[in-house]
């Protein structure tokens, strides 16, 4: 990889500096990692341009999750036809659902770039497996959904837990098993009589 005749090179390589100077003779591995990263960034740009405008290796549709003050753009995008990347993601989800047959599926959403994929999966689950309950937690809900009032998000998930997820998850499981009332849920948003 360091010899630069193994991977194709596109626009990210136009900005490349003198690698020998930057990494020296002892930095072959670091240099190879840097070149591989540039290749992956070029590949991501290509996929975004040609296949799916929301693509990102770890941040799918990140710009949609960044506008936490309004759910409108994200809601509209969730109702558009799926892209080939989303179709692949949903096919993987279907395999896991058929393999494990869960009654509860939870999504960890640490960053804005994980929100769209989690909601898209939740939407698909609600359409194809309406008896499965769907939970969501993680860093993004902790910071951006703390004061959620838009009930539309609950078309895609049933529960949003905040902060340390263990206690809310245990209470959610107790609630779903019929051992406690919904009012006993800890740090968890849900709809009760169409109100968050």
Language model features with spans:
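Short, compositionally biased "basic patch" segments
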Residues: 34-75, 85-86
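Glycine-rich beta-alpha loop elements in corrinoid/cobalamin-binding modules
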Residues: 3, 8, 12-15, 62-196
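Non-catalytic, alpha-helical, charged scaffold/linker segments
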Residues: 1-52
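Compositionally biased, intrinsically disordered low-complexity regions
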Residues: 26-29, 58, 67, 167
